[in-house]
Amino acid sequence: MSACTFFGHRDCPEAVRPKLREVLVELIERHGVDRFYVGRQGAFDAMARSVLRELAEVYPHISYTVVLERLPGPMDKAVWDFSDTIFPEGLEAVPPRFAISRRNEWMLKQADFVVTYVTH
């Protein structure tokens, strides 16, 4: 089967949700995508995760994973559910200022498809 990842601006209006859902349904039904990798940096990532959570009830064969850019600290553990996350091997040695870029490179290498939200 195939994998998909997401990249987009931090700010994302709720009006994007129906189109995102439509695109994801097409990827699942027409292109056999069953694995999704999501970041956690902004509204687009949160929206993608939310839509995937809904779609997993309709399409139980799909899975989604939040890909962490850094290991969680004590404060993160108090507010974040890490049950659906992974931390790619090798990122622990990456300087913090490069962590998101390296995580994104890892996600891109895993993906057959990329869904984006860009406003420029």
Language-model regions: role of each:
Residues M1-H120:
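Acidic/glycine-enriched connector segments
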